[in-house]
């Protein structure tokens, strides 16, 4: 990460896409997409996905590392080209506890990530815990971030410290997208960004972390990009120019969250304006969902009724029976809920792919379709971009490859924006 940031600060148009997903097909796609390039791939886990208690994936940081490396070995991607990052590392998962208890868990969280070889650490202590004022004072946020940084430094080996980089910042959207409809978004003020940096510098120095400050590579701000279930707020470069100009006088770049669904031109403009780390998650699993839904429609027409997976019906049944991952985000009416379950840009389906019933139904669908020739006309109907690539000889009409290429469509836009 440090090398890439140095190249950007030297005037090169270069950025990096941060893949924030624990889905094996998304990770496989991210690695396979860049297998034949010289680029490194940044894959990040969030604190609610992966933590010392397992998170919602059931994986600790060490488990996640091995999970990613196993996929890398399978696709022939060199492990040393992978950068592992930890996102929202702080009290995010334990906000209902008092600050002392939440920070104690957060310290162990950060230590486990660093011990497991994660080298890009987002120190995010911005959320209020039980009994805290809302919002937290910037000084409190910075002091807690310094505690987390001290924890990271205390377990890092000399070799790890050479690679270790930190991201700071408090203006982070709700992990995974907005819960309600959005019409506009607040762009971070330069004064607030400067204050975030100033308070963190002061807190780090007070804890004897002067050297660690040199490892702070980025600050999280809101450049004016966001999405909810059916709306996307697109990047307006002119609105972010004060931020773009301010960061030029520092050693850092910006990290932009929730950049999903922007145009490829917007990604190029974001990187030009020093938002050099572009995080993406739901857009990748949304593309995966689109591919699976398309293949399910194809299966419906090609496979005998008694042999079909019933994949789409299984997904809806499971999500309606077990609504904990979408209930507080989606609309309440039955028809509206179904539309959101299927098509929301927030893509809460991503939490359900590991469910045994859904996983089994998708596997059945894939086996069914691997055993037949899919007519080109059906691929044109349901996966038109993939049809064009089949026609030009870039792609085969194999279900797994069709899913990969659908995810590649998202990655292609980021590659354009981050181009070396």
Swiss-Prot record:
Keywords: Galactitol metabolism. Pathway: Carbohydrate metabolism; D-tagatose 6-phosphate degradation; D-glyceraldehyde 3-phosphate and glycerone phosphate from D-tagatose 6-phosphate: step 2/2. It comes from the Bacteria. The keyword Transmembrane helix does not apply. InterPro entries: Aldolase_TIM (IPR013785), GatZ/KbaZ-like (IPR012062), GatZ_KbaZ_carbometab (IPR050303), TagBP_ald_GatZ (IPR023436). One of its GO terms (cellular component) is plasma membrane. SUPFAM superfamilies: Aldolase. GO terms for biological process: D-tagatose 6-phosphate catabolic process; galactitol metabolic process; phosphoenolpyruvate-dependent sugar phosphotransferase system. Belongs to the GatZ/KbaZ family. GatZ subfamily. Component of the tagatose-1,6-bisphosphate aldolase GatYZ that is required for full activity and stability of the Y subunit. Could have a chaperone-like function for the proper and stable folding of GatY. When expressed alone, GatZ does not show any aldolase activity. Is involved in the catabolism of galactitol. Forms a complex with GatY. This is D-tagatose-1,6-bisphosphate aldolase subunit GatZ. It comes from Escherichia coli (strain SE11). The lineage of its organism: Bacteria, Pseudomonadati, Pseudomonadota, Gammaproteobacteria, Enterobacterales. The gene is gatZ.
């Amino acid at each position: 990460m440090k090398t890439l940031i140095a190249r950007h600060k030297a005037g090169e148009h270069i950025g990096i896409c941060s893949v924030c997903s624990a889905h094996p097909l998304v990770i496989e796609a991210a690695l396979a997409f860049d297998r034949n390039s010289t680029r490194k791939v940044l894959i990040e886990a969030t604190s609610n996905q992966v933590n010392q208690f397992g998170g919602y994936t059931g994986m600790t940081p060490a488990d996640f590392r091995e999970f990613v490396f196993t996929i890398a070995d399978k696709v022939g991607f060199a492990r040393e080209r992978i950068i592992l990052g930890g996102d929202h590392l702080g009290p995010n998962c334990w906000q209902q506890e008092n600050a002392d208890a939440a920070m104690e868990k957060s310290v162990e969280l950060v230590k486990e990530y660093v011990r497991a070889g994660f080298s890009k650490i987002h120190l995010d202590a911005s959320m209020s815990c039980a009994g805290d004022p809302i919002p937290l004072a910037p000084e409190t946020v910075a002091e807690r971030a310094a505690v987390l940084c001290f924890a990271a430094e205390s377990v890092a080996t000399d070799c790890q410290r050479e690679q270790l980089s930190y991201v700071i910042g408090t203006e982070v959207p709700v992990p995974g997208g907005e819960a309600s409809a959005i019409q506009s978004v607040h762009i971070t003020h330069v004064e607030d960004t400067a204050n975030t940096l100033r308070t963190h510098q002061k807190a780090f120095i007070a804890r004897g972390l002067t050297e660690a400050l040199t490892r702070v590579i980025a600050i999280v701000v809101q450049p004016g990009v966001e999405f909810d279930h059916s709306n996307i707020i697109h990047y307006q470069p002119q609105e972010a120019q004060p931020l773009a100009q301010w960061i030029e006088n520092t050693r850092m770049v910006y990290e932009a969250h929730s950049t999903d669904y922007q145009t490829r031109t917007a990604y190029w403009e974001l990187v030009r304006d020093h938002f050099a780390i572009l995080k993406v998650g739901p857009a990748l699993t949304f593309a995966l969902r689109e591919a699976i839904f398309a293949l399910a429609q194809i299966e419906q027409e090609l496979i005998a009724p008694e042999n079909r997976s019933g994949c789409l019906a299984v997904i809806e049944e499971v999500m309606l029976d077990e609504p904990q991952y979408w209930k507080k985000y989606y609309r309440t009416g039955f028809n509206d809920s179904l539309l959101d379950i299927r098509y929301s840009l927030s893509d809460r389906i991503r939490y359900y792919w590991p469910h045994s019933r859904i996983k089994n139904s998708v596997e059945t669908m894939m086996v069914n379709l691997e055993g037949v020739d899919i007519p080109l006309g059906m691929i044109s109907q349901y996966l038109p971009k993939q049809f064009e690539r089949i026609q030009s000889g870039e792609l085969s009409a194999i279900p797994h490859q069709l899913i990969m290429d659908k995810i590649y469509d998202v990655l292609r836009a980021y590659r354009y924006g981050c181009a070396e």
